[in-house]
A protein has these predicted regions:
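Secreted, luminal/periplasmic, and some membrane-associated catalytic domains
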Residues: 65, 81-82, 91, 113-134, ...
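C-terminal, low-complexity/hydrophilic appendages and adjacent surface loops
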Residues: 398-432
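Non-catalytic, well-ordered alpha-helical segments in soluble enzyme domains
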Residues: 71, 141-150, 344-379, 429-430, ...
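Bacterial Sec-dependent N-terminal signal peptides
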Residues: 1-41
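His/Asp/Glu-rich, glycine-adjacent segments
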Residues: 104, 109-240, 248-254, 372-377
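A long, amphipathic alpha-helix that forms part
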Residues: 216-238, 251-289, 449
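Short, solvent-exposed turn/loop segments enriched in Gly/Ser/Thr/Pro and often Arg
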Residues: 80-100, 160-169, 247, 295-297, ...
């Protein structure tokens, strides 16, 4: 039996029919265009982390900025104004790793730039690797750039550049084609044998033609090398998304008065950002790149002479306290080296001795806490929130205004609990300009990048994308 065909010609002969058809076609065209826009991933992601950038300073010097740096980011970008790290204390290494992995040191195991190795009882650098000298092997989870490599069967190109070794390596991830930093001795760019030598030829050529830069122009040196990395490695030239991690610095030196130097740092950083962002867009195309700009949440506070202003202060001696604790535990449980070591604000107990003597770990921790809390300068004592293979059993929180001092190493350690405000800014194609004051945490950056380039979030990341 033949099916009857629908004859729409009579409908098209009417003005109302033609109107409905035109409206229907326009709707289909709009839906198709929107679908295309939503599905196109940027060809290049540039993740810029600025060490010690602060919102209060950023806003204070706003009248001095040019149009294409911070002003453009704040006017054209999607700006999250209230950002913090979901753990404390924070330093450059733990911050950059959190941004890359979308999780905390509890999972990624990068708790700081340096920790005490319980097996050797010696300080260990966060990117130390006995085989390659330095590498990202200490990161215990995948990073967003690692997942990009996995998703593209290794075809995506991934690079990290920074002034410092740890920032370059940690931001680039395990599977990167290269991580590069400035050698403190030679002022030339260098890398690790961990990375494939084929991807390092461009930096050797770059070193050959570029003079060693001044210390106060390090941000410009990093941005210039990053632009050369894009050109020489053809980043963002095809439909496979590439990834470039760049670490800049808003850290203050000691060359002039703090207020004057702070102004100089932010004005200089503004110019560097403006030039770098424009340079990337010229090379890749404005519609083909997504920028992510954030900060480490860390800050160097100048030493304050509280005594001069009659503000309560003092010094807590970690070495003396560790000796006192060992004497106390020896009196309770018998003579022995119950305290193995101490580092920064942490005390390491002798796990083997505790186990051999069949002593309850929770009991010895409780007794230790009770003693330490009676010590002047101690506000609280906590157990380690992380793996005790790389952290102490007891974490001492000093009384506000007090510093922790180790007489053996002649080093002072102080953690300020003051909130350091900083933003997260997304800039690029299909990103709507908006200021959002809802508080967020930095572990949401990685899944947002992952969603934007249509890949999985890092394997320990449980945070939701921001958009």
């Amino acid at each position: 039996m033949k099916k009857n065909k629908l004859d729409i010609q009579p409908l098209l002969n009417t003005s109302l029919g033609r109107f409905y058809l035109a409206a229907l076609l326009a709707t289909f065209n709009m839906l198709d265009t929107n679908a295309q826009n939503l599905n196109v991933a940027p060809r290049l992601v540039v993740n810029i982390t600025i060490d010690q950038l602060r919102t209060d300073y950023l806003e204070h010097f706003a009248p001095l900025y040019k149009q294409d740096g911070f002003r453009r980011l704040l006017s054209e970008g999607r700006v999250y104004e209230a950002v913090e790290y979901p753990f404390s204390p924070v330093d450059r290494a733990s911050a950059i790793t959190c941004i890359a992995t979308g999780t905390t040191p509890h999972y990624n195991k990068i708790i700081a730039q340096q920790w005490l190795n319980r097996k050797t009882l010696r300080p260990e650098y966060c990117v130390y690797d006995k085989h390659d000298i330095v590498s990202p092997k200490n990161i215990a989870t995948s990073t967003v750039s690692d997942e990009l490599k996995v998703s593209t069967n290794g075809r995506a190109l991934v690079f990290g550049l920074a002034q410092s070794q740890d920032a370059a390596i940690l931001s680039a991830g395990h599977a990167a084609d290269g991580a590069f930093w400035i050698d403190d001795r030679t002022s030339a760019w260098t890398t690790s044998t961990y990375y494939p030598s084929t991807a390092n030829s461009w930096i050797r050529a770059y070193n050959a033609v570029n003079n060693r830069g001044r210390k106060d122009l390090l941000n410009d040196i990093v941005s210039d090398a990053a632009l050369n990395c894009i050109t020489d490695n053809a980043l963002g030239r095809d439909d496979i998304t590439d990834y470039l991690a760049v670490t800049l610095s808003a850290r203050l030196g000691n060359t002039m008065g703090q207020r004057q130097e702070m102004e100089h740092v932010y004005i200089s950083l503004d110019a560097t950002l403006g030039s770098f962002i424009s340079g990337v867009e010229q090379k890749v195309g404005k519609d083909n790149v997504m920028f992510v700009i954030t900060a480490t949440g860390d800050t160097d506070e100048p030493e304050t002479d509280y005594k001069k202003y009659k503000i309560p202060t003092g010094t807590f001696y970690i070495n003396r306290t560790a000796q006192l604790l060992n004497m106390y535990l020896s009196a309770v449980y018998g003579s022995g080296a119950w305290v193995e070591s101490y580092f920064k604000n942490q005390i390491f107990l002798n796990h083997k001795l505790i186990e051999d003597n069949k002593i309850s770990y929770s009991e010895i921790i409780l007794r230790s806490k009770d003693l330490l809390k009676m010590t002047a300068g101690v506000a609280d004592v906590k157990t380690s929130p992380y793996d005790t293979e790389i952290t102490g059993d007891l974490w001492i929180e000093a009384t506000p205004g007090w510093s922790i001092f180790n007489e053996d190493t002649n080093t002072s350690y102080q953690v300020r609990t003051v909130f350091v405000p900083f933003p997260v800014i997304f800039l690029g194609s299909n990103i709507k300009a908006e200021h959002i004051d809802i508080p967020i945490t930095t572990e949401r950056i990685a899944p947002t990048i992952a969603k934007s380039i249509h890949i999985r979030a890092p394997n320990a990341c449980s945070a939701k994308p921001l958009f």
